[in-house]
Structures are given as C-alpha cells and as structure tokens.
A protein has these predicted regions:
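Active-site and donor-binding regions of nucleotide-sugar-utilizing enzymes
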Residues: 1-141, 159, 163-165, 188-191
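Conserved catalytic-core segment of nucleotide-activated headgroup transferases in glycan assembly
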Residues: 1-3, 140-195
Length: 195
C-alpha cells in the first residue's frame, strides 16, 4: 500500500534470524545491534525509522529511551505480562519507565491489560495472539473434545468466546432464529445469575 516505505526486520537471536532471513515481507533483514547507548544512537542514525514495532517480550531499555527522546512512534504487539514480572515489582521502576516509550501496547490477554492499568498505563488494547502461524498451528494440533462432539452431533456449531453481556444480548436473537445450529458461549466472566 505504501511502496515508498521500507520494512526493516531485525532479530536479536540467531534462531529467529535463521527462520526469517529470507522473508519476502521485509526489505531488509539483519541482527539488531546490542542494546547499548552508543549502538542504539548509531543504529537509529543509520536506519531513520518512522515507526518501530516490538514483539512480545522485546523490552530494550536503551532503544525505547532513545526512540522516545527522538519522538519516534513505537508499538508493542502480542505482549504478555504476568503478575510476577519485573514491571510489577517494587524495584521495577526502570522497566516501568521503559514502557512509557510505547505509543500503544497490544496485549494477548485481559489479565495483561489489567496489570498494566494498575500501574498507570491506559494505552493498552487486548488484541489476542497476533501470530497467525502460531494460531494456525494450535488449531491444527487441536484434539476433538468428546463432550463437544456429542453436543454438536451433525449440526453446525457456533462458538462465541470471551463474551460479555452486550455480546450475549446480540447473540440471543441469532440463537432463537437458528434452532438447527448448536451454540457454545464461553463468557469472559462467569456469573451464576447469567447461567
């Protein structure tokens, strides 16, 4: 869509690089220089990025600090945060400050969003696991669940996951209008009053 823009794909680990070193979706592919202040400045001076995307666990403090200082937009995608990680510890202020560099964070779970919200970050969107290849592999490896197979029988099956009340209000007419379809609704929060 934007042929004048170039995509630069970097890796820190040899395993990631080896898998994607010939990836056709990027214009340039190479190793990310080690996260030292001088390396970061030199790399950014050469690359002149307009936008930077970090994936999952990529929290390079010097890169993030310099990107913020230069006003270069940065995003974090497919991130997962856990209660016991350094960001949520009393000694994690340096790491929390690094998160300030992100214009937007796309996390995999509501739990991650909640944890970040508790320490003052509202620029967080729950987007799930954006790695299509991983999602497809999980789907291919899925084992049939006997109780679901028996429930489904020969009927079409509609599954709605992580639903909220407003979602279920929309689904109700669909359910009533399709008596030959089986529905599985997995609410985001299970409340006895809604069962």
């Amino acid at each position: 869509k934007y042929p004048e823009l170039k995509i630069l794909l970097t890796f820190f680990s040899p395993s990631g690089y080896e898998i994607r070193k010939n990836y056709a979706g990027a214009d340039y592919i190479f190793y990310l220089p080690v996260d030292t202040p001088s390396n970061v400045k030199r790399f950014l001076d050469i690359a002149h990025p307009e936008l930077v995307i970090f994936v999952k666990y990529e929290f390079w403090i010097n890169y993030l600090s310099e990107l913020k200082r230069r006003g270069i937009r940065s995003y974090l995608v497919s991130a997962i945060f856990r209660r016991d990680s350094v960001f949520f510890r009393s000694y994690g202020s340096m790491w929390r400050k690094a998160l300030d560099a992100f214009d937007q964070m796309f996390v995999q779970s509501e739990e991650s969003r909640e944890l970040l919200h508790r320490i003052g970050f509202d620029n967080v969107i729950v987007a799930g696991d954006t790695r299509f290849d991983r999602v497809a592999a999980i789907a291919r490896a899925a084992k049939p669940v006997d109780i679901v197979a028996r429930f489904k029988g020969d009927a079409p099956l509609f599954v709605a996951g992580s639903t909220w009340g407003p979602d279920e209000d929309i689904l109700l007419p669909l359910i009533n209008a399709n008596p030959k379809v089986r529905f599985v609704i997995a609410p985001h929060e299970i409340e006895e009053s809604r069962i």
